[in-house]
Amino acid sequence: APEESPKRAPSGFLGVR
């Protein structure tokens, strides 16, 4: 799940601003 890998998720997803 992207929630476990915020760095793999798109910018501004979970804590990735």
UniProtKB/Swiss-Prot annotation:
Residues spanning the signal sequence: none
Arginine amide: residues carrying this PTM: 17
Compartment(s) of residence: Secreted
Keyword vocabulary terms for this entry: Amidation, Cleavage on pair of basic residues, Neuropeptide, Secreted
Keyword check for Secreted: yes
UniProt entry tagged with the keyword Secreted: yes
Expression by tissue: Midgut and brain.
Disulphide connectivity of cysteines: none
A GO BP entry: neuropeptide signaling pathway
GO cellular component: extracellular region
Summary of the function given for this chain in its UniProt record: Myoactive peptide. Increases the amplitude and frequency of spontaneous contractions and tonus of hindgut muscle.
Protein name in UniProt: Tachykinin-related peptide 2
